[in-house]
């Protein structure tokens, strides 16, 4: 599909199963992740239905600050393991995500502001990042905004519908919560996914 040009981008997952001889202290692991990744969104969720999931991501899908009407998202794409000049492939990949996010937001927002791309470090990796600030139009349903944005090209591909179909047909593993989103919804007037 990539060779024929049907898909501009495709992100496939792979699964690794490891058997551990000792039990894991998930809370200690959570605190360790918070220390290792101070600028990431780190969360630990454990329920009988879903199991235990430790998540750490430098990416913000959608966030609202506690004061005012301003929302935020980012286009985080293009990855290198060192700082330096960016390859054209990484610049193009990030530009695709910027265009995708702008297109998704247009029907839902006013006062859309976009930063210039900059380098954002996440642990030992460097990413190209563009920030978006905006105000939601009155009567906009937050669920519709999320449905338009997610999954982003960074975890699925482009065009979204074709990439999703390809993944469901060819990947042969259940992603469960992998590449999903989590976070507080209107907790102390803050939302952060």
Show the residue positions of the predicted features.
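A glycine-rich phosphate-binding loop feature that marks nucleotide/adenosyl-phosphate handling sites
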Residues: 15-16, 47-53, 102, 117-125, ...
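A short glycine-rich, hydrophobically flanked beta-strand micro-motif that places a catalytic Asp/Glu
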Residues: 10, 41-45, 176-183
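An anion-binding catalytic pocket shared by soluble metabolic enzymes
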Residues: 14-96, 189-193
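Contiguous alpha-helical scaffold segments within structured protein domains
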Residues: 18-19, 72-168
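Short hydrophobic alpha-helical segments that form membrane-spanning helices or hydrophobic packing faces
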Residues: 11-15, 106, 187
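Glycine-rich, small/acidic residue-mixed loop/short-helix segments
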Residues: 156-162, 166-193
């Amino acid at each position: 599909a990539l060779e024929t040009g049907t898909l501009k981008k495709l992100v496939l997952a792979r699964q690794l199963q490891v058997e551990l001889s000792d039990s894991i202290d998930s809370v200690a692991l959570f605190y360790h992740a918070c220390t290792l990744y101070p600028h990431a969104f780190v969360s630990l969720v454990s329920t009988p239905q879903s199991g235990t999931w430790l998540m750490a991501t430098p990416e913000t899908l959608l966030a609202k600050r506690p004061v005012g009407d301003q929302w935020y998202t980012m286009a985080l794409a293009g990855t290198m393991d060192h700082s330096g000049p960016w390859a054209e492939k990484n610049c193009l990949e990030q530009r695709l995500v910027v265009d995708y996010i702008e297109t998704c937001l247009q029907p839902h927002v006013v006062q859309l502001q976009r930063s210039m791309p900059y380098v954002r470090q996440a642990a030992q990796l460097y990413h190209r990042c563009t920030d978006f600030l905006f105000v939601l139009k009155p009567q906009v349903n937050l669920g519709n905004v999320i449905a338009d944005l997610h999954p982003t090209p960074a975890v699925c591909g482009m065009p979204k519908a074709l990439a999703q179909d390809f993944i469901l047909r060819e990947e042969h593993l259940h992603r469960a919560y992998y590449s999903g989103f989590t976070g507080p919804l209107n907790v102390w007037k803050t939302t952060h996914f």
